[in-house]
Amino acid sequence: MPPRPSSGELWGIHLMPPRILVECLLPNGMIVTLECLREATLVTIKHELFREARKYPLHQLLQDETSYIFVSVTQEAEREEFFDETRRLCDLRLFQPFLKVIEPVGNREEKILNREIGFVIGMPVCEFDMVKDPEVQDFRRNILNVCKEAVDLRDLNSPHSRAMYVYPPNVESSPELPKHIYNKLDKGQIIVVIWVIVSPNNDKQKYTLKINHDCVPEQVIAEAIRKKTRSMLLSSEQLKLCVLEYQGKYILKVCGCDEYFLEKYPLSQYKYIRSCIMLGRMPNLMLMAKESLYSQLPIDSFTMPSYSRRISTATPYMNGETSTKSLWVINSALRIKILCATYVNVNIRDIDKIYVRTGIYHGGEPLCDNVNTQRVPCSNPRWNEWLNYDIYIPDLPRAARLCLSICSVKGRKGAKEEHCPLAWGNINLFDYTDTLVSGKMALNLWPVPHGLEDLLNPIGVTGSNPNKETPCLELEFDWFSSVVKFPDMSVIEEHANWSVSREAGFSYSHTGLSNRLARDNELRENDKEQLRALCTRDPLSEITEQEKDFLWSHRHYCVTIPEILPKLLLSVKWNSRDEVAQMYCLVKDWPPIKPEQAMELLDCNYPDPMVRSFAVRCLEKYLTDDKLSQYLIQLVQVLKYEQYLDNLLVRFLLKKALTNQRIGHFFFWHLKSEMHNKTVSQRFGLLLESYCRACGMYLKHLNRQVEAMEKLINLTDILKQEKKDETQKVQMKFLVEQMRQPDFMDALQGFLSPLNPAHQLGNLRLEECRIMSSAKRPLWLNWENPDIMSELLFQNNEIIFKNGDDLRQDMLTLQIIRIMENIWQNQGLDLRMLPYGCLSIGDCVGLIEVVRNSHTIMQIQCKGGLKGALQFNSHTLHQWLKDKNKGEIYDAAIDLFTRSCAGYCVATFILGIGDRHNSNIMVKDDGQLFHIDFGHFLDHKKKKFGYKRERVPFVLTQDFLIVISKGAQEYTKTREFERFQEMCYKAYLAIRQHANLFINLFSMMLGSGMPELQSFDDIAYIRKTLALDKTEQEALEYFTKQMNDAHHGGWTTKMDWIFHTIKQHALN
């Protein structure tokens, strides 16, 4: 199921001509050719068509024009009925300019909804109707129950519940205020400005209140009422009654954006207020009538689609058999027959023979030895060969999969053979109904991904490639007299009890399994200590076979250390039903673990459905909405590791997305951004469909956002392809002229920002928009903030639109920096990081927030003349900061620079962020330093002539040290430098304490396909930088050495910067 083939207005054409001839077929058989404006609406075209039709024969057979709609063929080769006649001709995405007039039939509302859903997800909904896979059809029906529950939940308390869905409180996970933030308050009190609109002309009045930081919004409103009524000279009783009457009728809104304080959280728990406290700013809140907000909220209706009433096509028993048998009663080894392959395209002159490599895997772990077919000539890829595996069918775990690949062999006699995978595929050995696969099957394979070093891809997607022109492998599984099912929990428990009692009867000296038998009765203190030590090991730390045996033999005691579960699961022999059954019984009653630990159980190492369900239940119990938002990128990615479409993780995320619109917004875009990826387009498309059916009126907002992004993609495609050789002036003229077209103005104004749905993008400020100079022609766009109080937050919103760069790596890096910042803040370290907004919205398409009042180091150095630009004057940056921050604010600017520089030194070192030059390090006017453009991380640094260009662990140049030491020549001997070092040390150790979290977050992203995050070897770089094999003292010594290397090797960075500056000046 591929996404839309192009972003053009007609097939193969980016923009329609200003006037275009459209062929219109009328119900009476007449064809009328109309000359239409490209931006003409369908209602205009229809009116003109019926006026023209009167000049043709048989016009008397036509009914009134309102009885008809247009239909045509779109670029997806789909027949689409156009019910919405406000749509413009250029936005219909027609294959050819041809329209047919018909009388509509069927359910009009459902057709309109299906079209809207198809547009926003980038795939016609009817494609799902055509899929014959019963799992797909059952999922579509069953997931509607989650949708219905979520919609009912939103309407539970009528308007308030609906408001909570649309404007969920944007709060920190904990109400506790970190000490260093509390110290910024005046005896625990905060000054808040409350604004009130007092006339239809939007005249404003303000009240300044000094209140306790832990007041709830209702108390703030009460205090505002008291202040407003002070001039009325009310008695204390009258005042009390007045407060009681009006307190519940008002709510607080953040001035300048769509954030509301709707719940009784302490004021300082709201992120806006906490940010104001940290930055030393006065919060501005608007008092508005609750009813005015409630009256704006749409009442969502949820209608079950027609496919929900269809009968399931899944047959409970294969081949018409009326009986089933348990997997565990079969007494034979697994075997699979490889029949033949088709569409295997190889160069016969380069390849000697081909063969099929196969393996039975559980996650990334083989359950038995891999087995290969015989080698055959490329010209005749037929095997008809049974492959026997060293595993009994009853020992197959629930998540077992067959992994296979067609491989080529190259090499002459006596020379070393070269084996290369040509295509790969995976098959679940149990389907979604717990049934063991049987019979013949054809599997279309997938192309080999970049960076795959092995012949098999066990953590890749299961199932057939929808592209039928790829290599196809035909194979056959054993048939059985009855349908074979994986046993249910009662059978598993019974078997577990039997195996435990059998184990208890073994003599330890007479069995080969003695080192794995349960020994909880003889647990010594040093055994307990060893278990605790194993528990604290990081997720990438290898567990030896002896340690696995030790863990398993003390499995019952492990329940008292709940967080050891991931290590215990890795010690299970998943090819032994005895151990799997016992593990299931342990997991069934395992105490809950923290969400950050539970997330580890969702990566590719833990494929078992019961284990993953346990992890999701922990998330349901303990994961706050704030933390869920923080980890949403990873939780969407690990959906790829789920065996089946319907699972607890899908249901958990969907329910959260449908009860919290902010979560739903990013849930939508994280799924939508991967719809071009064929390995997940069906899974993600189905999930997007179910979300869009139940998200209510927010679908209209998503429609507007997608429409705007489509317009921008089209514009940048033209600039990169058709206008690439034009001058900047000609390109800008084209951009402005195009944006002034009515369809572009409609699409690009008055919608919610995809970067932050609390921010509205109003009118485009065309005079402030520009095309940036880099090769991919990013657009720097500027919108007005239409909020009535915009001057109290920001009056314009600047966003960079990029088409051609993969922003997923930037998005991940910024998320990790944001999490680092949270850890530091909670530990009392205020390092003032600036993880600006960044969102990938499609295949190498995305948005980046522009940070206000910021400049690149290169721009600042160039202001210092030729010496500054060529790095000969290291005082340029310090002088610029002094000029920007004169008098008393100078010390604050240096402090802010020092803190942020320390934070980014530690973050860029730990994450191995490369390509650090003076164009991607920026400084704000107030002194805050931050990094941008994270195209290289985990030590994948740029190379020149085969050598890494960057020779220092992180950027700490003389320019920075001069600023930190306030201009001192011997900067390393100053107290300011010592303070800077102390900040770095504390920051490094704080992140080291949370090493497991960061390793888990990167591990969960392995399925993303990012070029620099392909394997656990890439993530091992974080183990190295955090020195996890060392003691804390040794780790600190290691980091100290890196820091010394950074500032002593700063001259090499300066040389890189000189060449970068010269190159940029040459390009411009």
Curated annotation (Swiss-Prot):
The UniProt record lists the C2 PI3K-type domain at 330-487
A molecular function (GO) held by this record is: protein serine/threonine kinase activity
Cross-referenced SUPFAM superfamilies: ARM repeat, C2 domain (Calcium/lipid-binding domain, CaLB), Protein kinase-like (PK-like), Ubiquitin-like
Respond yes or no to whether keyword Chloroplast is given for this record: no
Give the matching CDD domains.
C2_PI3K_class_I_alpha, PI3Ka_I, PI3Kc_IA_alpha
Listed A to Z, the keywords are: Angiogenesis, ATP-binding, Kinase, Nucleotide-binding, Phagocytosis, Proto-oncogene, Serine/threonine-protein kinase, Transferase
Q: Where is this region: G-loop?
A: 771-777
Reaction(s) this enzyme catalyzes, per UniProt: a 1,2-diacyl-sn-glycero-3-phospho-(1D-myo-inositol-4,5-bisphosphate) + ATP = a 1,2-diacyl-sn-glycero-3-phospho-(1D-myo-inositol-3,4,5-trisphosphate) + ADP + H(+); a 1,2-diacyl-sn-glycero-3-phospho-(1D-myo-inositol) + ATP = a 1,2-diacyl-sn-glycero-3-phospho-(1D-myo-inositol-3-phosphate) + ADP + H(+); L-seryl-[protein] + ATP = O-phospho-L-seryl-[protein] + ADP + H(+); 1,2-dioctanoyl-sn-glycero-3-phospho-(1D-myo-inositol-4,5-bisphosphate) + ATP = 1,2-dioctanoyl-sn-glycero-3-phospho-(1D-myo-inositol-3,4,5-trisphosphate) + ADP + H(+)
Know anything about its domains from the record? The PI3K-ABD domain and the PI3K-RBD domain interact with the PI3K/PI4K kinase domain. The C2 PI3K-type domain may facilitate the recruitment to the plasma membrane. The inhibitory interactions with PIK3R1 are mediated by the PI3K-ABD domain and the C2 PI3K-type domain with the iSH2 (inter-SH2) region of PIK3R1, and the C2 PI3K-type domain, the PI3K helical domain, and the PI3K/PI4K kinase domain with the nSH2 (N-terminal SH2) region of PIK3R1.
Q: How does it assemble?
A: Heterodimer of a catalytic subunit PIK3CA and a p85 regulatory subunit (PIK3R1, PIK3R2 or PIK3R3). Interacts with IRS1 in nuclear extracts. Interacts with RUFY3. Interacts with RASD2. Interacts with APPL1. Interacts with HRAS and KRAS. Interaction with HRAS/KRAS is required for PI3K pathway signaling and cell proliferation stimulated by EGF and FGF2. Interacts with FAM83B; activates the PI3K/AKT signaling cascade.
The protein depicted here goes by the name Phosphatidylinositol 4,5-bisphosphate 3-kinase catalytic subunit alpha isoform
Source organism per entry reads: Mus musculus
